[in-house]
Amino acid sequence: MIVVTGGAGFIGANLVKALNARGREDVLVVDDLSDGTKFVNLADCTLGDYLDKDDFLARVKAELRGEPSELPPIEAIFHEGACSDTTEWDGKFMLENNFEYSKVLLHFCQYKRIPFLYASSAATYGGSEVFVEAPEHEKPLNVYGYSKLLFDQYVRVHWESFDAQVVGFRYFNVYGPREQHKGKMASVAYHHHSQVKRGENPKLFGAWDGYEAGMQSRDFVYVGDVVDVNLWCLDHPEVSGIFNLGTGRAEPFKAIAETVIDYYATGKIDYIDFPEELKGRYQSYTRADISRLREAGYKAEFKTVREGVSAYLDWLNG
């Protein structure tokens, strides 16, 4: 079986759907469905099994102790499960979910000598102006970013002891299908779609941090492209490392709003004051340096904002 933790979530559910498209139905999804609305992300997928994240962790720990675990044979783990709320400041909760849990799965994969492909984050860079996978550029602005950095550091420290593939993906701003459950943490593209559907105008932050209104820029990457990179790495077990996963381009938030307005042929951008609570904790600019990913052999192109958002809107209206 292939395990996808966070498999009912945004990137995880897209991975499950893509594995199904490859003919893989032996997928074990691990998640927490306390928020039952997430089931819709898996409603059109085929699963081999489902386990609650706490039950799965207990079985993994039992296996590591040499005890009976009732786990099926596992050939790879995609570890997408995490608390991804950048406004969450409970550090104990964040480290339990994003650091301690990840450590156990990492050691399990090494024990079984199977691939471990996990979600890191561009939040590890925080206030940096350079987005290269190196410690001198890692300056997280929130405890979420720190929890992801802490695990990346753990991986680096133990790197020489690994016998099986380990790949960390520093996701930049991912958007696309199956993210509706994320609420306020869903992408700007999703929020702009929702605003227009309610008869409102798309809203963006006004001028701030030296940027004109709507011109704060991020590396926006379509979830389908993210899934393609994950699966490419699974297909290339010789590839290991921590890689930025973005497009290599920075595009302004305004480009998303304009794409949504053009798609629906209605509305204009409303600019709002930059929130006080985000000042000093907000990345006004990101652009993934994807040199390391390219050097590893990944050649496929990434969608532009206009291409990706248009495809996303087609899906939302399908």
UniProtKB/Swiss-Prot annotation:
Pfam families: Epimerase. Its EC number is 5.1.3.20. It catalyses: ADP-D-glycero-beta-D-manno-heptose = ADP-L-glycero-beta-D-manno-heptose. Its cofactor is NADP(+). CDD domains: ADP_GME_SDR_e. Catalyzes the interconversion between ADP-D-glycero-beta-D-manno-heptose and ADP-L-glycero-beta-D-manno-heptose via an epimerization at carbon 6 of the heptose. Homopentamer. NCBIfam families: heptose_epim, PRK11150.1. Belongs to the NAD(P)-dependent epimerase/dehydratase family. HldD subfamily. This is ADP-L-glycero-D-manno-heptose-6-epimerase. It comes from Chromohalobacter salexigens (strain ATCC BAA-138 / DSM 3043 / CIP 106854 / NCIMB 13768 / 1H11).
